[in-house]
Amino acid sequence: MNLNKQVAIVTGGASGFGAAIARRLSQAGAAVLVADLNAEGAQRMATELNAAGGRALGMACDVSKEADYRAVVDAAIAQLGGLHIVVNNAGTTHRNKPALAVTEDEFDRVYRVNLKSVYWSAQCALPHFAQQGHGVMVNVASTTGVRPGPGLTWYSGSKAAMINLTKGLALEFARSGVRINAVNPMIGETPMMADFMGMEDTPANRERFLSRIPLGRFTRPDDVASAVAFLASDDASFLTGVCLDVDGGRNI
């Protein structure tokens, strides 16, 4: 797929799914602004992409804050020459535990990062997309937003809301030439795996979760990156409001 002359923002792009997404978009020809709460990690990823022949910029960003998100959008336009793709990948979870054991602070953090980020991306990026008559947003949701499991109730609710927001925004902005889709990964090999499992990340504990996945493995960062790159490309030009499961059959 060809993303030449496209400029993309990837939030949470310093590690995990986000890093793989940033690499894949860069390999496809897009200039990439890597935004992450970890400023050093964002700069490191941008340096990697530039060294590989891409064009990238790294910035610190708290996606729950308007000023931070707007600064990232403005930087993409001013320093990379435009904005055509926004990937809302930054996210967080509470540790896997009973719903009533989740504290108010944990609840607020999950909803602030997972949902307010979509609000600010819409406020900051969608007017630009609508004005230029085209643009793509891809939200990284979760299979738990479709099929919740015990121990992740509040996290699952945040991802279900993200999926519904994706569809609502897709309807509202379709006539402006803007496509808005989501991907729903299964539990993946990222630094948050222990939190999702609610136990130490060991081979034995992983096996308990693998038994639920028909294809017999966890979601890999490259799986998510491939799905995001497809949805961001013209190969998916007639897809909007789609929530693509990247889960090895978990949601069947």
Curated annotation (Swiss-Prot):
It comes from the Bacteria. It catalyses: 4-formylbenzenesulfonate + NAD(+) + H2O = 4-sulfobenzoate + NADH + 2 H(+). GO terms for biological process: catabolic process. Substrate binds at S142. One of its GO terms (molecular function) is 4-formylbenzenesulfonate dehydrogenase activity. Its EC number is 1.2.1.62. Keywords: Aromatic hydrocarbons catabolism, NAD, Oxidoreductase, Plasmid. The active site is at Y155 (proton acceptor). NAD(+) binds at residues 9-36, 62, 159. Homodimer. Involved in the toluene-4-sulfonate degradation pathway. Does not discriminate between the sulfonate and the carboxyl substituents and can also be involved in the p-toluenecarboxylate degradation pathway. Belongs to the short-chain dehydrogenases/reductases (SDR) family. This is 4-formylbenzenesulfonate dehydrogenase TsaC1/TsaC2. It comes from Comamonas testosteroni. The lineage of its organism: Bacteria, Pseudomonadati, Pseudomonadota, Betaproteobacteria, Burkholderiales.
